[in-house]
Amino acid sequence: MKGLIGKKIGMTQVFNDEGNLVPVTVIDVGTCQVVGKRTPEKDNYSAVTIGFGEIREKILNLAERGFFKKANAPYRRHLKEFRVTPEEAASFNVGDAVKADMFAKGELVDVTGITKGRGFSGVMRRWNFKGSQTKTHGTHEYQRHPGAIGQRKTPGRVYPNKKMPGHYGVDQVTTQNLTVVDVDVEKGLVLVKGAVAGHNNGVVYIRPSIKAAMRAQHKAARGA
């Protein structure tokens, strides 16, 4: 099983083994713990539930308290279920700590987070419209307006999913194929190359790269 919940600390830069300066995102995964398991006999699939971050009991509702007490697991603020094989699930017990050394230096990972909220935004910021600097295209006085949004009598309506001004941000985004630059087990930190979605102190999920695994499978199939 490979998967961690972490908190985005922020961005910095480090020197790699070749002496090049690399921008990295620092993710704190120090308090991950196994709080539940799914078995094929009971749930028809196999998975391990990871908890992250401490929380007081009085903040939890009755259902959440019952889940932790039934599993005899510590209270955790954030939960995430990771699919595993039955053999992998058997190697984990409720209460086990999951540390940063689950991922190795140089490994490719996918990091999922919630993007920063930007409120009500126009089409140039939200959809990267070029704007009308020379021609109007229906923008009237302002060149940052979206312009015409439809036709005349036919079809006589605005098509669904038309790109228009509106709320921008607070979307779940997965950044794929990020390289693990370094792992600090003592401090519970994972450093990944590049930026990940979300604001500082936001919760992120780290998984092995899906595309890297698919490429390895295709390469093995071609070699066979």
UniProtKB/Swiss-Prot annotation:
It comes from the Bacteria. One of the primary rRNA binding proteins, it binds directly near the 3'-end of the 23S rRNA, where it nucleates assembly of the 50S subunit. Residues 132-153 are annotated as: Disordered. It comes from Myxococcus xanthus (strain DK1622). The keyword rRNA-binding applies. One of its GO terms (cellular component) is cytosolic large ribosomal subunit. This is Large ribosomal subunit protein uL3. InterPro entries: Ribosomal_uL3 (IPR000597), Ribosomal_uL3_bac/org-type (IPR019927), Ribosomal_uL3_CS (IPR019926), Transl_B-barrel_sf (IPR009000). GO terms for molecular function: rRNA binding; structural constituent of ribosome. Pfam families: Ribosomal_L3. Keywords: Ribonucleoprotein, Ribosomal protein, RNA-binding, rRNA-binding. The keyword RNA-binding applies. One of its GO terms (biological process) is translation. Part of the 50S ribosomal subunit. Forms a cluster with proteins L14 and L19. Belongs to the universal ribosomal protein uL3 family.
